[in-house]
């Protein structure tokens, strides 16, 4: 989970980008950017389910308005095979940072070395103590009726030095977690890497700034496939690479904390206009190598899927103008397309190639062939949206961060002075469900309608009075989730191939540079009472929502959805 950055382009720079994503756009999944893609239109013939349309909620203004009873989503709006679940990541919940042979990660080092960079000067040493309390997490999932748990593997827990000898205690921990999930009829979806690179590799050669990490990541992925692949059938190679690159190597507010000299970060010895692209390039190469290995050696029966989870922000033009309309397109390119287009067609968006120049690395033909069509499934992490406002390319504006390269600003208020949606408990999340629907339709119309899971979606309570007087009465989170689940249904009704919705997060966790001051969980973690788990109102709603008997849900016959019956929850 993280705040997302904006992006942009001068409309005269690349004329092919003048059409908005949608009915006037070329389908980039079908368009071949290189000869490598002539036989790789994997998602071109997907079946689109028809369904009973949900009743849309009333538009959201600058304040919260209560949903009508018929607008609150029901489980029987969705096919019986649509998956509801929750997500977490290793560093944010596990704790046990140096137990049972685990090596330090970049986040261990960052929090211990630069505690002032965390808003409440905390760290993930204990976090929610899920390393010891994982059975309580599984119980919470079961109590809510969730069918999926998406979690990540701590690289340095199973490979303390990042490569070489495997730590069996780490393997044992994840085996116990996976087995417990399966015993409780919960499907594990595993993220191989969620920002916590082994510090040993950072010290050895600079982590993701060095191409050597591609082979080391491949070894790490193989350890995961070999030890867990008999039970884990759904994998995400990387989580939110866009946010990672921007925050870790651009602004430097996340581990390893690098930025350009003269900027305010932990390690002002980097290059905020070049290093984010270098790290991102190596992430994509590592993804391609891991996918090739997976398909050649660990999916011989074809019953497993692999992909990537992308952070996405919705965008609207700041005002009704050609320039802001194009700014919106560039913002989407820099936010989503940076990592999506390489795994779809084998190269970066045209707008990025035009504006970034030689700071953006190039792929070889062989690398393009490995990257193109390399995702069986895709995850979208959606929280909020912004207005995108054009910035002229001129001597008056000099990019200092990689996010400036897009020549567009992200605005919370439109040209009329109104917020894009109601502000939630977290300063950066404005509720705008339409942004999620729009993005899903872009995936359908521009990118070939790949199978999508909403792998993160939620809001935080701020852990201080008066914002969070009763941590269990999270009515704003409940309203937010209900509206966004409805937004997913709206996209499905328009043909988007969405397969599941996973709330972020299962439990309150260490929220990176915000420490424990922002609580995203469906389940409250009482740190004053041994990290005891307590279901919030939103969790209890999910328990009711998911309680509809399977026999009353929709069934699929001849690729068309038929509603057997309908119940209210």
Curated annotation (Swiss-Prot):
The active site is at 240 (proton donor), 456 (nucleophile). Pfam families: Glyco_hydro_1. Its EC number is 3.2.1.182, 3.2.1.21. Keywords: Chloroplast, Disulfide bond, Glycosidase, Hydrolase, Plastid, Transit peptide. A beta-D-glucoside binds at residues 92, 194, 239-240, 383, 456, 504, 511-512, 520. It comes from the Eukaryota. Residues 1-50 form a transit peptide. Changing residue 513 to F: 16% loss of activity with DIBOA-Glc and 94% with DIMBOA-Glc. PROSITE patterns: GLYCOSYL_HYDROL_F1_1, GLYCOSYL_HYDROL_F1_2. InterPro entries: Glyco_hydro_1, Glyco_hydro_1_AS, Glyco_hydro_1_N_CS, Glycoside_hydrolase_SF. Expressed in young seedlings early after germination. It is found in: Plastid, Chloroplast. Wheat is a hexaploid with three different genomes that contains at least four genes coding for GLU1: GLU1A (AC Q1XIR9), GLU1B (AC Q1XH05), GLU1C (AC Q1XH04) and GLU1D (AC D5MTF8). The monomers can aggregate in diverse combinations, reflecting the several isozymes found in the native enzyme described in PubMed:10750901. Homo- and heterohexamers. This is 4-hydroxy-7-methoxy-3-oxo-3,4-dihydro-2H-1,4-benzoxazin-2-yl glucoside beta-D-glucosidase 1a, chloroplastic.
